[in-house]
A protein has these predicted regions:
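Solvent-exposed, polar/charged alpha-helical surfaces in well-ordered, non-transmembrane soluble domains
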Residues: 39-43, 73, 86, 90, ...
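Gly/Gly-Pro-rich "capping" loops immediately C-terminal to redox-active cysteine motifs
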Residues: 54, 58-93, 109
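Short pre-active-site segment immediately N-terminal to redox-active cysteine/selenocysteine motifs
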Residues: 48-52, 60, 117
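Electrostatic cytochrome c docking/interface patches
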Residues: 27-48
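C-terminal capping alpha-helices of c-type cytochrome domains
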Residues: 97, 108-128
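N-terminal secretory signal peptides that target proteins for export/translocation
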Residues: 1-9
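Bacterial N-terminal signal peptides
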Residues: 12-22
Length: 128
């Protein structure tokens, strides 16, 4: 039997491993009908003529998002930061409503992205 700090460390490691396994399993469980939306949203988010999110944001949860941009906040934990999808949608549609001094373009208001394209990008962002 392990005593003292060793026992505490062993229990801590076990809890962390169990929690990590549960977390990784839960984020990999996207519904099959969401997968095409996520892929399409990712493409729109990274496309220079559309979302161009990589120009300003890091995507720590996406190994294929090759950027060093740090103008805007890192796009991670989006679902927990914006549990209300409508609030995130409004932010993408016209970010000047939340922050009049933002440099982020009003993608919907200025017609850069259609309404359905914003929804696809949100589907992707919710995986981050």
């Amino acid at each position: 039997m392990v005593h003292g700090r060793g026992a505490l460390f062993s229990r801590l490691v076990a809890v962390l491993l169990a929690g990590s396994a549960f977390f990784l399993h839960s984020i990999s469980q996207a519904r099959p009908d969401e997968a095409p939306n996520v892929a399409a949203g990712r493409q729109l988010a990274f496309e220079i003529a559309k979302g161009n999110c990589l120009a300003c944001h890091l995507f720590p949860g996406d190994a294929g998002a090759d950027t060093l941009a740090n103008i805007g906040p890192a796009l991670q934990a989006i679902r927990s930061r914006f549990p209300d999808r409508a609030r995130l949608r409004a932010r993408l549609w016209d970010p000047t409503q939340a922050n009049p001094n933002t440099v982020m373009p009003p993608f919907g208001k200025h017609g850069i992205l259609r309404s359905d394209e914003i929804d696809l990008i949100i589907d992707y962002l919710y995986t981050q």
